[in-house]
């Protein structure tokens, strides 16, 4: 039977792995971090999470319908969500399908499928898959626009922000009104 690779053990990767396994399709997962959670795992070095982060969509529109969130809080914080994703992965047997601390280093079309090369605790391996799902956290890389001129102060993208202590006693100019920018402006007003 054909197997599929899922790259990333965040919410999208877990949803893809669950959808495939529910249909009897074999799955091997790859995750660069040490555990399930993706960007919701503040301990993941690639995470852009900060201490006060919480859902911006309600719990009932975010949870997986077949596995409701135990929390009754409408907008739970990131630690509740990280645990929820870990519980979901354990409940549906997805955790054991992932190779953690393993990076995908190459993906090449081969024989109607894909050769996937990974590097992790087991060393470097190449395996063939009928298909590959990319759920590798595109938001982990900050998008920092170029500004003309020079600036002698510190520039910090919200992806490097973790807690209010980083900015305590400082004057800050916030550029941008995305979700993170709005959250941080409310924290520091």
List each model region and its residues.
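Beta1/beta-strand and adjacent pyrophosphate-binding region of the FAD-binding site
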Residues: 1-12, 171-175
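Short hydrophobic core segments
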Residues: 7, 127-139, 173-175
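N-terminal Rossmann-fold NAD(P) dinucleotide-binding loop
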Residues: 13, 181
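Glycine-rich FAD pyrophosphate-binding loop
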Residues: 21-44
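Glycine-rich active-site loop/strand segments that organize a redox cofactor
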Residues: 39-83
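Feature captures the FAD/FMN-dependent oxidoreductase FAD-binding
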Residues: 74-131
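Glycine-rich beta-alpha-beta "Rossmann" dinucleotide-binding loop(s) and their flanking helix/strand
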Residues: 136-160
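Conserved small/polar residues in nucleotide/adenosyl-binding loops
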Residues: 187-189
């Amino acid at each position: 039977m054909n197997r599929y690779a899922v790259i990333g053990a965040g919410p999208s990767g877990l949803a893809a792995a669950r959808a495939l396994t529910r249909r009897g399709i074999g799955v091997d997962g790859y995750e660069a971090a040490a555990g399930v959670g993706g960007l919701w795992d503040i301990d993941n070095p690639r995470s852009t999470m900060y201490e006060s982060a919480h859902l911006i969509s309600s719990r009932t529109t975010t949870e997986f319908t077949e596995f409701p969130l135990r929390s009754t809080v409408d907008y739970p914080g990131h630690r509740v969500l990280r645990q929820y994703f870990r519980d979901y992965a354990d409940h549906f047997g997805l955790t054991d399908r992932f190779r953690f601390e393993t990076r995908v280093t190459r993906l090449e079309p081969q024989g109607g499928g894909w050769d996937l090369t990974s590097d992790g605790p087991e060393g470097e391996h190449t395996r063939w898959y009928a298909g590959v799902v990319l759920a590798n956290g595109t938001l982990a890389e900050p998008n920092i626009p170029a500004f003309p001129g020079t600036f002698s102060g510190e520039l910090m993208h919200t992806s490097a922000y973790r807690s209010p202590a980083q900015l305590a006693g400082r004057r800050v100019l916030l550029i941008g009104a995305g979700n993170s920018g709005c959250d941080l402006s409310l924290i520091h007003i």
